[in-house]
């Protein structure tokens, strides 16, 4: 059997599981993933009445299965044995959920640990008010309609009541268009900025290097700024977690910000473990920017990242200034790390946002706190299609915003998913009406260190043109000051020229050499960076949002080669030689 066929069978194989009797009545030849069949509920019956009728008392396993069955299909839920057997079963599970009150969801936890209690505690005071009690009596279908009809200000009055499980449950009932309608009217801008506001869509520059080479990193920042991209954070994923190596990257990024007098306009972040960032901060006080941490949906899953609630609370208490905390999450991470705990990916993801909301409440109101949902990074064991990627992003945007968070997206795919470069463009266009706070930004769609596909500088420019999004006003003014954007708010003659930004940088450093000398040096720098396998964009195609045609062709050839290598079969004569 070829690898592609093997994985296809892995994704398709199922065992159907009947909720009433627990009897397996259909079996594949290879893999055994339970699927949930839901017998027809009674008229007006809610989840807990159904469970009582079927089991005689509350049954948490059945509860988890019903909530999982209410989800849109994803392979990750299927592997966990909590995916609906059919669209009809999914509809029945949603009918039961729709009749269930918010208060009943709040009182019946799918899984209890210190993290779920921390989330509950962050909403408890409001739940005990008269307004909170009134909200708790709403059925999920009524709550969904309220969200669809209410405006931003009205929705924000409801947020203090909402636990993470309630938020995940209402999202299960929504169509993609309903998710877009809600996401496009809830906004939590970062204090003192337009980032996260309606009509604005920012960028995290992701200047990664396969070798943590400082030249690779800073030139990607010059590159981003030459395309008027990069107003939220300069966020590097380091290869090494050595504190000295992390400190070098922190200082290089901080130097860029201070040289251009941007240290109060945007932040930087080196995405090492938060312990390492705190260690670096002891030596370089005030120069580490946003403190980053990957987070999970349960206490045990967070132990995989070597973090605890107490550790995160301790670090949150140390963030006294403007630049607070930055998290990354993604559906499926808990399950693929062995901590699914029997409940679905959507609730896991929502609980991550609940944790971050609770930590945000401990910071001062002027601190920047945001979260990046990395959707698609794990691969087809979580979900495999472009339609599922869109659904995941829309679900997570709404859940993040209902938690009161400024949330961005890493709309990404791995090489072993069934999502191509062109498919990724389609996904972006489906998601953009929901107005995420920000996206990733690289010279091309390919990350040279992480080896996955995400959004390029050109994608940002195309999105702005097509959807009318703007970037933070202060950075737009900076790009005009740097003569990247002209007085008419159009690309200038220097647009798409990272050497021009390098020239500006050196002039600010006091370099008195001629432009020709600096340009010659800059072009040599770009050549060195490219030789290390790190793309640097320069110029553009017919439109300013079109990638340079030569670079576009190069990336497509690399993508085709990578896909071919990934699925290439071992030659039969080589296999035979191993047995000789």
Language model features with spans:
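C-terminal segment of N-terminal export signals and the immediately downstream linker at the start
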Residues: 1, 20-42
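N-terminal export signals
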Residues: 5-27
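Glycine-rich, proline-tolerant flexible connector loops at the mouths of alpha/beta enzymes
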Residues: 233-250, 376-384
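Alpha-helix-loop-beta-strand connector modules within alpha/beta enzyme cores
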Residues: 246-270, 315-316, 390, 394-403, ...
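N-terminal small/glycine-rich loop or linker at the start of catalytic domains
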Residues: 187-209, 329-338, 409
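Catalytic alpha/beta core domains of metabolic enzymes, predominantly
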Residues: 281-428, 434, 440-442
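Extended, intrinsically disordered, low-complexity segments
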Residues: 34-75, 108-129, 133-136, 140-168, ...
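Active-site mouth loops of central-metabolism enzymes
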Residues: 202-216, 414-420
């Amino acid at each position: 059997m070829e690898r592609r066929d093997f994985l296809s069978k892995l994704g398709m194989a199922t065992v159907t599981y009947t909720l009433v009797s627990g009897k397996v009545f259909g079996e594949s030849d290879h893999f055994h993933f339970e699927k949930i069949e839901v017998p027809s509920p009674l008229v007006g019956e809610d989840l807990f009445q159904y469970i009582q009728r079927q089991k005689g008392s509350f049954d948490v396993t059945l509860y988890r299965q019903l909530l999982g069955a209410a989800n849109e299909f994803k392979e990750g839920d299927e592997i966990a044995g909590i995916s609906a057997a059919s669209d009809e079963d999914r509809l029945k599970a949603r009918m039961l959920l729709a009749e269930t009150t918010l208060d009943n969801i709040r009182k019946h936890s799918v899984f209890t640990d210190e993290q779920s209690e921390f989330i509950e505690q962050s909403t408890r005071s409001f739940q005990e008010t008269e307004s909170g009690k009134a909200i708790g009596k709403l059925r999920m279908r009524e709550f969904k309609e309220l969200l669809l009809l209410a405006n931003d200000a009205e929705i924000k009055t409801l947020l203090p009541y909402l636990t993470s499980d309630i938020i995940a449950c209402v999202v299960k009932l929504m169509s993609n268009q309903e998710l877009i309608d809600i996401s496009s009217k809830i906004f939590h801008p970062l204090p003192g900025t337009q980032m996260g506001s309606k009509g604005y869509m920012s960028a995290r520059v992701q200047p990664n290097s396969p070798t943590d080479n400082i030249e690779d990193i800073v030139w990607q920042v010059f590159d981003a700024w030459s395309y008027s991209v990069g107003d939220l954070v300069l966020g590097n994923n380091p290869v090494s977690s050595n504190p000295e190596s992390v400190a070098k990257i922190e200082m290089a990024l901080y130097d860029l910000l201070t040289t251009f007098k941007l240290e109060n306009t945007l932040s930087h972040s080196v995405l090492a473990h938060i312990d390492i960032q705190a260690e670096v901060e002891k030596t370089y006080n005030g120069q580490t920017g946003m403190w980053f941490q990957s987070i999970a949906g349960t206490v045990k899953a967070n132990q995989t990242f070597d973090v605890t609630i107490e550790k995160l609370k301790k670090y949150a208490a140390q963030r006294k200034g403007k630049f607070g905390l930055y998290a990354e999450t993604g559906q499926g991470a808990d399950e693929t790390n062995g901590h699914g705990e029997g409940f679905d990916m959507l609730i896991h993801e929502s609980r991550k946002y609940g944790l971050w909301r609770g930590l945000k409440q401990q910071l001062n109101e002027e601190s920047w706190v945001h979260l990046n949902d990395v959707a698609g990074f794990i691969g087809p064991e979580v979900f495999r299609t472009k339609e599922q990627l869109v659904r995941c992003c829309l679900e997570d945007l709404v859940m993040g915003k209902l938690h009161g968070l400024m949330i961005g997206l890493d709309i990404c795919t791995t090489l072993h998913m069934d999502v191509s470069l062109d498919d990724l463009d389609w996904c972006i266009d489906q998601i953009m009406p929901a107005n995420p706070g920000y996206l990733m930004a690289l010279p091309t769609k390919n990350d040279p260190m992480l080896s996955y596909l995400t959004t390029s500088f050109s994608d940002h420019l195309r999105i702005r043109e097509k959807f009318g999004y703007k970037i933070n006003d202060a950075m737009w003014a900076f790009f005009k000051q740097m003569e990247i954007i002209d007085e008419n708010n159009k690309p200038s003659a220097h647009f798409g020229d990272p050497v021009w930004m390098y020239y500006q940088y050196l002039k600010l450093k006091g370099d008195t050499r001629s432009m020709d000398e600096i340009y010659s040096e800059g072009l040599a720098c770009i050549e060195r960076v490219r030789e290390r396998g790190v793309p640097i964009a320069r110029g553009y195609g017919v439109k300013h949002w079109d990638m340079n045609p030569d670079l576009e062709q190069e990336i497509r050839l690399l993508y085709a080669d990578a896909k071919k290598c990934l699925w290439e079969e071992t030659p039969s004569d080589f296999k035979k030689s191993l047995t000789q």
